[in-house]
């Protein structure tokens, strides 16, 4: 027997189960959104991304029968063969042949018992029935299935995709900075005013670190703006996550006031110095720039090996009034602000438009409902006229990567404290050279004169 054949069989054993499993049951538009929806015969370029870095196929070769495997896209049968596959997706209550067999339906585990499939009823992050109702109903926003969220439980999403703990009473009651109103345009986008000084959308991954990611994102933007671009680093959310662990919960959430305390007292290095890794590990990790290193004569050492270990500090944060006009004026004058809001189960499926929380999950029962606090950057505002009725919105940058929402951004109803989006809004100024500090003090004095 040739030596090569010894190694061929194990490889085939690994490949066949993957193909035979296929991508069936993952809702969403795949073949149907291609320019040329389906391809005749075999076409290895007739693909659509699915489940992160995987590909599914829309060519007639993708379904090679039970022995040949199946790597077709989930909507292949409906789009390319015109078959109604709705009934095929129902598992719970259907008959089965072997007691003890198990299947997965989205995030649910289904077991064959007494000749019938019984699923455990776990609420999933992607709920196909809600997707369908949003698609066919009259809503101000659209929804879609995200392959990165498919197969994940709702509780898992709340735990690892959010991460801001509800502010303590003393923090909620902090004094608000009042701002003299100014003439406000119908639309404003910080990216238009400050361009490259506004940093791109982050991706917190599977770590409940929005408390860290949003704080460093706001700091990065504000430092760049107040320094007029002389400081334009993306600050390290990993350092804040790993090193600010006193009374924090790492990848299971944190308090914004303690995050701001750390960045004010010690400062945070750039992301190039201390890159983000917790999105894959689900752990905050050990602090690689301990507090004692700040007094080291040799300076801080970058975990990445970079020679640039400059640490940047911020001034004490301030709470912006919850009045719509005050938030707008602060945003247009000083840059993006940090907002905490309540994320409900349907928000995970947001694709575009002006988000307004629906009661579709509540209609199904309490087990389909969940919520948690999340913090994001607010970059601007506008008015949506697409539905025939003007809808005011806030423009926000989420931290779920650019594949989610509108390239990582979302719009949410403005002026009604929807999902508490206007209840806890934070701003801060960056610390820099003495010249910049004097500039900020003069700026503060000008603000104080406004209020006299």
From Swiss-Prot:
Leader sequence segment: 1-20
One GO BP: proteolysis
Matching CDD domains: Peptidase_C1A_CathepsinB
Disulfide cysteine pairs (residue numbers): 38-46, 38-58, 46-80, 56-58, 56-73, 62-72, 73-80
Pfam families xref list: Peptidase_C1 (PF00112)
Keyword terms of this UniProt record: Disulfide bond, Glycoprotein, Secreted, Signal
Main subcellular location of this protein, as a coarse class: secreted
Localisation: Secreted
Single GO MF descriptor: cysteine-type peptidase activity
PROSITE patterns membership: SMB_2 (PS50958), THIOL_PROTEASE_ASN (PS00640), THIOL_PROTEASE_HIS (PS00639)
A cellular component annotation (GO) from this entry: extracellular space
Glycosylation site list: 145, 232
Domain annotation SMB: ranges: 34-85
Family per record: Belongs to the peptidase C1 family.
Protein name from the UniProt record: Uncharacterized peptidase C1-like protein F26E4.3
Organism in which the protein naturally occurs: Caenorhabditis elegans
């Amino acid at each position: 027997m040739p030596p090569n054949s010894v190694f061929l069989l194990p490889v085939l054993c690994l490949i066949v189960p993957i193909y035979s499993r296929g991508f069936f049951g993952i809702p969403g538009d795949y073949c149907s959104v291609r320019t040329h929806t389906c391809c005749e015969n075999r076409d290895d370029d007739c693909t659509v991304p699915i489940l992160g870095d995987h590909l599914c196929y829309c060519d007639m070769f993708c379904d090679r029968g039970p022995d040949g495997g199946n790597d077709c896209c989930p909507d292949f049968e409906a789009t390319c063969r015109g078959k109604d596959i709705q009934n095929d997706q129902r598992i719970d209550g259907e008959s089965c042949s072997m007691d003890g067999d198990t299947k997965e339906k989205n995030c649910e585990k289904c077991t064959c018992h007494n000749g019938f499939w019984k699923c455990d009823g776990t609420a999933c992050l992607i709920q196909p029935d809600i997707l369908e109702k949003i698609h066919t109903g009259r809503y101000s926003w659209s929804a879609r299935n995200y392959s990165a969220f498919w197969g994940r439980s709702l509780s898992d999403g709340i735990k690892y995709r959010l991460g801001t703990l509800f502010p303590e009473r003393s923090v909620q009651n902090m004094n608000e900075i009042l701002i003299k109103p100014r003439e406000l345009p119908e639309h404003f986008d910080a990216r238009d005013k400050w361009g490259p000084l506004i940093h791109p959308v982050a991706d917190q991954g599977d770590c409940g670190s929005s408390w860290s990611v949003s704080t460093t994102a706001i700091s990065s933007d504000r430092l760049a703006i107040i320094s007029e671009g002389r400081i334009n680093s993306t600050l390290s959310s990993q350092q804040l996550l790993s090193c600010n662990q006193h009374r924090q919960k790492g990848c299971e959430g944190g308090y914004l006031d303690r995050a701001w305390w750390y960045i004010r007292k010690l400062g945070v290095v750039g992301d190039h110095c201390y890159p983000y890794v917790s999105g894959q590990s689900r752990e905050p990790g050990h602090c690689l720039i301990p507090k004692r290193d700040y007094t080291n004569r040799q300076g801080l050492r970058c975990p990445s090996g970079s020679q640039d270990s400059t640490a940047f500090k911020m001034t004490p944060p301030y709470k912006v009034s919850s009045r719509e006009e005050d938030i707008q004026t602060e945003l247009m004058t000083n840059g993006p602000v940090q907002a905490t809001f309540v994320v409900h189960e349907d928000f995970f499926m947001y694709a575009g438009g002006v988000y307004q929380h629906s009661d579709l999950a509540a209609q199904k029962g309490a087990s389909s409902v969940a919520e948690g606090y999340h913090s994001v950057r607010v970059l601007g505002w506008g008015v949506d006229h697409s539905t025939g009725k003007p809808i005011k919105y806030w423009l926000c940058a989420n931290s779920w990567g650019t594949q989610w929402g509108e390239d990582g951004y979302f719009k949410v109803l403005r002026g009604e404290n929807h999902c508490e989006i206007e209840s806890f809004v934070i701003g801060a100024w960056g610390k820099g050279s003495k010249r910049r500090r004097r500039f900020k003090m003069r700026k503060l004095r000008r603000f104080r004169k406004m209020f006299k």
